[in-house]
Every structure is written in structure tokens, then in C-alpha cells.
Amino acid sequence: MKFFTAAALFAAVAIAGPVEVRTGGGSICPDGLFSNPQCCDTQLLGIIGLGCEVPSQTPRDGADFKNICAKTGDQALCCVLPIAGQDLLCQAAVGAA
């Protein structure tokens, strides 16, 4: 009986452990809600993105993301959920300031 308890505990710990290793670098947008990189024409009230599109290239870092969006006159933002070119919740991309 103790063996099954120990085996179940070991299996639970193994399953609960993270599968991928995160180094902390190279992330443009934070994980979670604001995980969609967008190039937006304008940002209203600091939270609403208008005229948003996916970047034309895959950015390497925040500065590259800012440069990609700047080519079309847009701002580099991380948004919650793009709907028809409008994003209700956006924040500045990491390293794009």
C-alpha cells in the first residue's frame, strides 16, 4: 500500500512539473492575456488599439518589433484579443519603449 502511495505521489509531481524551460529572454509580449503582438495605428486611453494588424515579420526582440511596426507608421503593442482590427486591451510591448 505504501508503494502505491509513493508511486502516485511521484507520478503527480512528474506530471505537475513544467515541460519547457523558459530562459526569460526574447519575449516580446507577456504570457497570459496580453500575448498577441500587434502593430496598431493608434492607441486610445492607453488601452484601446485601433487599426491593428499582425506584424509583417516575426520580431526578434522589442526593438525589432518597434522597428517593424514603425515602417508602416504603427505602434508596437501587446493586445488581448484582436477582433476586426480593433483591440480592446493593449499595452506597450516589452523593450519597445
From Swiss-Prot:
Its main location: secreted. Disulfide bonds join C29-C78, C39-C69, C40-C52, C79-C90. It is found in: Secreted; Secreted, Cell wall. Residues 1-16 form the signal peptide. InterPro entries: Cerato-ulmin_hydrophobin, Hydrophobin_sf. Keywords: Cell wall, Disulfide bond, Secreted, Signal. Induction: Expression is highly up-regulated in the presence of root and stem powder of Shanxin poplar, but also during carbon or nitrogen starvation. It comes from the Eukaryota. It holds the Pfam family Hydrophobin_2. GO terms for cellular component: extracellular region. Aerial growth, conidiation, and dispersal of filamentous fungi in the environment rely upon a capability of their secreting small amphipathic proteins called hydrophobins (HPBs) with low sequence identity. Class I can self-assemble into an outermost layer of rodlet bundles on aerial cell surfaces, conferring cellular hydrophobicity that supports fungal growth, development and dispersal; whereas Class II form highly ordered films at water-air interfaces through intermolecular interactions but contribute nothing to the rodlet structure. Belongs to the cerato-ulmin hydrophobin family. Homodimer. Homodimers further self-assemble to form highly ordered films at water-air interfaces through intermolecular interactions. This is Class II hydrophobin 4. The gene is HFB2-4.
